Structure formats: structure tokens, C-alpha cells
Amino acid sequence: VDKRRPIWVMLLSSYWQDGNSLGVDAIMTNYPEDVK
């Protein structure tokens, strides 16, 4: 894992790779300022 990447980028990547909305839900819950 490249620690230089923000956690939300890794979560978003997991969302696209897994096709699972939980990745986006985690971003919305934990990093609301990043998605506004």
C-alpha cells in the first residue's frame, strides 16, 4: 500500500474494484468534507 495516498482514495479504489457501495458509504461517513 502506498501510504502517500489518502485513505479515501484507497477506499474509493476498493469501491470500484469490488463494486460495493460500502466503500462510498465509508467515505461519506468518515470524510464528509472530502465529498462535498
From Swiss-Prot:
Which reactions is this enzyme annotated as catalysing?
an N-(acyl)-sphingosylphosphocholine = an N-(acyl)-sphingosyl-1,3-cyclic phosphate + choline; an N-(acyl)-sphingosylphosphoethanolamine = an N-(acyl)-sphingosyl-1,3-cyclic phosphate + ethanolamine; a 1-acyl-sn-glycero-3-phosphocholine = a 1-acyl-sn-glycero-2,3-cyclic phosphate + choline; a 1-acyl-sn-glycero-3-phosphoethanolamine = a 1-acyl-sn-glycero-2,3-cyclic phosphate + ethanolamine
Cofactor binding description: Binds 1 Mg(2+) ion per subunit.
An individual GO BP term: lipid catabolic process
So which tissues is this one expressed in? Expressed by the venom gland.
Q: Where in the cell is it found?
A: Secreted
Its GO CC terms are: extracellular region
Q: Does the keyword Cell cycle apply?
A: no
EC number, UniProt record:
4.6.1.-
Q: Name one GO molecular function term.
A: metal ion binding
What is the main EC category here?
lyase
What does this chain do?
A: Dermonecrotic toxins cleave the phosphodiester linkage between the phosphate and headgroup of certain phospholipids (sphingolipid and lysolipid substrates), forming an alcohol (often choline) and a cyclic phosphate. This toxin acts on sphingomyelin (SM). It may also act on ceramide phosphoethanolamine (CPE), lysophosphatidylcholine (LPC) and lysophosphatidylethanolamine (LPE), but not on lysophosphatidylserine (LPS), and lysophosphatidylglycerol (LPG). It acts by transphosphatidylation, releasing exclusively cyclic phosphate products as second products.
User: What family is it from?
Assistant: Belongs to the arthropod phospholipase D family. Class II subfamily.
Protein name according to UniProt: Dermonecrotic toxin LgSicTox-beta-LOXN2
Q: Which organism is it from?
A: Loxosceles gaucho (Spider)
